[in-house]
């Protein structure tokens, strides 16, 4: 029994939800998202709530039940509040700058790294922090992971790009014999 799937999703004011067959359509202002639920999950809209239930008692239907409820909830939260991830840059000479729709990173390589910002994502650079914001949780996480991947933090000095809430396990350096 899915504990997540059982919970109804309250539709906040300003968000329109339509159900067309297996397709859930969400809209708030000029933002619109769609969620294609599989045939083995029932979706109902009752009393300003979205309810999910499995069609069968097989394992696959129960697995999709909680998954699609979580995906729909993330869409509702993304349309109303949005998602954000914060990255920190540590290291001498490491810096980031925005140039239009391109994020330019200087991370100790012989050349700057230019990262094209995808649509629907807003990036704010403030000194050594990069804030990635957007309405799609998956895309925000993916963009933050791609930026971190250019120079992941190393365990000796902690230089590199890391999430603001990430803890780096530090290692001791070499010791000399005496």
Curated annotation (Swiss-Prot):
Top-level taxonomic group: Bacteria
GO molecular-function term, one example from the UniProt record: structural constituent of ribosome
GO BP terms in the entry: cytoplasmic translation
GO cellular component: cytosolic large ribosomal subunit
Record InterPro entries: Ribosomal_uL6-like, Ribosomal_uL6-like_a/b-dom_sf, Ribosomal_uL6_a/b-dom, Ribosomal_uL6_bac-type, Ribosomal_uL6_CS
Gene3D superfamilies: Ribosomal protein L6, alpha-beta domain
Keywords in alphabetical order: Ribonucleoprotein, Ribosomal protein, RNA-binding, rRNA-binding
Family to which the UniProt record says this protein belongs: Belongs to the universal ribosomal protein uL6 family.
Function comment: This protein binds to the 23S rRNA, and is important in its secondary structure. It is located near the subunit interface in the base of the L7/L12 stalk, and near the tRNA binding site of the peptidyltransferase center.
Subunit and interaction comment: Part of the 50S ribosomal subunit.
Full protein name: Large ribosomal subunit protein uL6
Classification lineage: Bacteria, Pseudomonadati, Campylobacterota, Epsilonproteobacteria, Campylobacterales
Gene transcribed to yield this protein: rplF
